Amino acid sequence: MQSGQALVTQRPFRAPHHTVSDAGLLGGNINPTPGEISLAHHGVLFLDELPEFKRNVLETMRQPLEEGSVTISRAAGSMTFPSAFMLVAAMNPTPDGKMPGESSSSQREIQNYLSRISGPLLDRIDLHAEVPQVKFQEITAKRDGEPSAAIRERVIAARQRQEQRFDGSVRVTCNARMQARDIKQHCPLADEPKNLLRMAMNELNLSCLLYTSDA
């Protein structure tokens, strides 16, 4: 390895199975070792079939998602690992994977399935996207999609803008790590969007955490 060369040159991508334990996700064992959230540091942690993960395992991510680190305490002492990762999750709308109007699951079963993910954890996921059912004509239609290379260039450009915005700050490295004071500095709201956000807070009973994320 040459002088000044980084040990890791690519952002990690981790996709643990839904049977992972809390020690496997956060880290642990007798001699504390990093878990999946630390192995995904500065990269992506992808959780597929999110409601299939044990609820107590998912809940352990709440504090690391906010703080960007996790502390493992054992009898011999404690150790803090970095865990500033991007959480990407996917799930079906119903237990059998069908759309709500076509599912054979009862309303109670669907509600129990969705309630496996707590509100506080959902508050820590900044973007939610509902994917509609794709029709056969859309699947078979001949049309060119945007190439991955073009998307990659947009992502790189966005990252570079964020690096310039925060001017080498150790505490804030990207938009997701901004706190309330950073948002006020870099993303001041005009009166109209501020009023819209106030209405949403009142109508939807949004939490303070969601207010900061949406602002």
Regions found by a protein language model. Give the residues of each.
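Walker B catalytic acidic pair
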Residues: E49
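Short clusters of hydrophobic/aromatic residues that line enzyme substrate/ligand-binding pockets
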Residues: F13, L25-L26, I37, V70-I72
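AAA+/P-loop NTPase substrate/partner-engagement loops
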Residues: M1-S21
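Short, basic, glycine/proline-bearing loop/turn elements
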Residues: T19-A23, G101-E102
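Conserved alpha-helical scaffold flanking the Walker A/P-loop in AAA+ ATPase domains
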Residues: A23-V44
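Basic, amphipathic alpha-helical bundle interface domains used for macromolecular binding and assembly
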Residues: P32, N56-S213
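Short, flexible hinge/linker loops that cap or flank conserved catalytic cores
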Residues: H17, N31, I37-S38, M79-F81
